[in-house]
């Protein structure tokens, strides 16, 4: 199967701080992959490095075979990459629907507003509500929905289940499975292991800015002792 993302010997810095040390992993087209690890392990920095949002990067980041380690962020986005940061970045003075209308089409095949409302009925009900009046769960749905509007097919999702009610987490899990069926490639950073476990095809565990363990979904049960040791799950 063709690779959507191939990372080799990736190093990244914030100023003088050397955060990522020779990170190596790949994601096939249509796969869901989860980066696991404790806070500070380098998972979010990995997503930011893929998008060109860290200060300095070295090594190789290939997206659909194209080298991007020296590309600016806007060009990376135009390769069909969507990034949903942990902070959500909802425009609070705009309505939910106005937020949805903001993203530019980067690639053909982005979801229509009606498609989004079918996937997230809550947003349809709250379409005229200001961003500040949306619940945390509704804001998270909106943040994910915006990148689905762009036509991006490689999605980088940072802690999308964090701090949300179980019913919202369930909605997001259904969304991931639906997107997977539609051929999207997804890289998730997740602290919520119960959320990620049934969704991902493969798992990479990070520690101190490196990949220290990797395994496929069928190996999950056999790896629980290792995960407990590394993550405390």
Q: What are the language-model segments listed below?
A:
Residues 51:
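Helix-to-loop junction immediately C-terminal to a conserved catalytic motif
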Residues 55, 67-88, 113, 125-129, ...:
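ABC ATPase NBD coupling module
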Residues 147-148:
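ABC ATPase C-loop
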Residues 159-160:
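Walker B catalytic motif
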Residues 36-38:
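The feature captures the beta-strand-to-loop junction immediately N-terminal to the Walker
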Residues 130-134, 138:
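Conserved ABC ATPase signature
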